[in-house]
Amino acid sequence: MIVKRGDVYFADLSPVVGSEQGGVRPVLVIQNDIGNRFSPTAIVAAITAQIQKAKLPTHVEIDAKRYGFERDSVILLEQIRTIDKQRLTDKITHLDDEMMDKVDEALQISLALIDF
């Protein structure tokens, strides 16, 4: 399986503990493409369609029509994890550079790499 940074797949994130995002849901691959090429794992961020959640600076909204989603959704950059690529199933879409710039900014905030 060839996985690229910016790809969105369905993945089964179960089992979970506490407030972790779980179940079969879309995830965004945020790992660099060298890691994606050589590692059996991928670093991903969970995506939810629960857009009424509190808007955090670590959230990036996805327009369903523009990116081929069934519903408007939110990328949760505070919900990142490393998963085996075997958890990835169907590819949904690939996010463009404009969207990935927003993801990068939210990720930097999540990891305290920039002041907020």
Swiss-Prot record:
Changing H59A: Not toxic in E.coli. Changing D90A: Remains toxic in E.coli. Changing N32A: Not toxic in E.coli. InterPro entries: PemK-like (IPR003477), Plasmid_toxin/cell-grow_inhib (IPR011067). Keywords: Endonuclease, Hydrolase, Nuclease, RNA-binding, Toxin-antitoxin system. Changing T48A: Not toxic in E.coli. Changing Q21A: Not toxic in E.coli. Gene3D superfamilies: 2.30.30.110. The keyword Cell division does not apply. Changing K53A: Not toxic in E.coli, 70-fold decreased RNA-binding. Changing E78A: Not toxic in E.coli, 625-fold decreased RNA-binding. The record marks R25 as: Transition state stabilizer. GO terms for biological process: mRNA catabolic process; rRNA catabolic process. GO terms for molecular function: DNA binding; RNA binding; RNA endonuclease activity. Changing S19A: Partially toxic in E.coli. Homodimer. Forms a complex with antitoxin EndoAI in which the toxin activity is inhibited. One dimer binds a ssRNA substrate, forms a heterohexamer composed of alternating toxin and antitoxin homodimers which inhibits the endoribonuclease activity. Antitoxin prevents RNA binding to the endoribonuclease. Belongs to the PemK/MazF family. Replacing all Arg residues by canavanine yields an enzyme that recognizes a longer consensus sequence UACAUA, thus altering its substrate specificity. Still cleaves between the first and second nucleotides. Toxic component of a type II toxin-antitoxin (TA) system. Specific for 5'-UACAU-3' sequences, cleaving after the first U. Yields cleavage products with 3' phosphate and 5' hydroxyl groups. Cannot digest substrate with a UUdUACAUAA cleavage site. Overexpression is toxic for cell growth (shown in E.coli), probably by inhibiting protein synthesis through the cleavage of single-stranded RNA. The toxicity is reversed by the antitoxin EndoAI. Toxin activity cannot be inhibited by MazE from E.coli. The EndoA-EndoAI complex does not seem to bind its own promoter. This is Endoribonuclease EndoA. It comes from Bacillus subtilis (strain 168).
